[in-house]
């Protein structure tokens, strides 16, 4: 009987913990009426990209390591449990962002050049940001969109500097924002 009670209380604790975790991101979303969630790609050791960078060749890029893949999977698990429904999932054309989107495993995604990094001049900042702003302006404010991108893109739009795997919930109308990190 004692063992049964122990299991019961452990189960109740786990259910409460999960319910809290699920409601935290939903609460933030609701508090600012976020219609966009930016996520910086998961852990990819290093800085920038190698000198021989080619967008179409992942071997010339800084990529996710095993810890980064695990991080993206755990973020995906968290998002699945949160019951957030994304009308669209878009990712930068960089391999570390594409791999993050794949590892999230939360739905169909497409690449979008309006999320590409302009750090080190591989893309033109004005071009990238114009595409992103046009995308934000062209959709229904009630739709929730997930963008997998780079720190420079998120910072340029929101003035936030997210860590790898960190999310910035954003209201594209009011410009309100809030950062959120799934610990792993």
Where are these regions (language model features)?
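Bacterial N-terminal signal peptides
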Residues: 7-16
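Active-site-proximal alpha-helix that buttresses catalytic centers in soluble enzyme cores
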Residues: 22-122, 160-184
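Positively charged n-region of N-terminal signal peptides that target proteins for export
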Residues: 1-6
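A short, acidic, amphipathic alpha-helical segment used as a generic capping/interface helix at domain edges
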Residues: 129-138
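Bacterial Sec-dependent signal peptides at the C-terminal "C-region" and cleavage site
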Residues: 15-23
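Alpha-helical scaffold elements lining the catalytic groove of polysaccharide deacetylases
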Residues: 122-128
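Generic beta-sheet signal
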Residues: 34-37, 141-149
């Amino acid at each position: 009987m004692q063992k049964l009670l122990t299991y019961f209380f452990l189960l109740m604790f786990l259910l409460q913990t999960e319910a809290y975790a699920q409601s935290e991101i939903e609460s933030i979303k609701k508090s600012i009426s976020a219609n966009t969630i930016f996520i910086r790609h998961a852990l990819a050791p290093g800085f920038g990209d190698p000198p021989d960078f080619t967008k179409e060749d992942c071997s010339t890029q800084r990529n996710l390591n095993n810890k980064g893949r695990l991080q993206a999977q755990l973020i995906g698990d968290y998002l699945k449990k949160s019951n957030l429904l994304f009308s669209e999932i878009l990712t930068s054309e960089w391999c570390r962002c594409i791999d993050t989107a794949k590892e999230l495993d939360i739905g169909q995604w497409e690449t979008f050049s309006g999320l590409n990094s302009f750090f080190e001049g591989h893309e033109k900042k004005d071009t990238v940001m114009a595409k992103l702003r046009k995308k934000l302006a062209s959709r229904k404010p009630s739709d929730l969109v997930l963008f997998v991108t780079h720190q420079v893109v998120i910072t340029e739009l929101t003035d936030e500097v997210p860590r790898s795997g960190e999310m910035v919930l954003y209201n594209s109308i009011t410009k309100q924002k809030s950062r959120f990190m799934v610990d792993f």
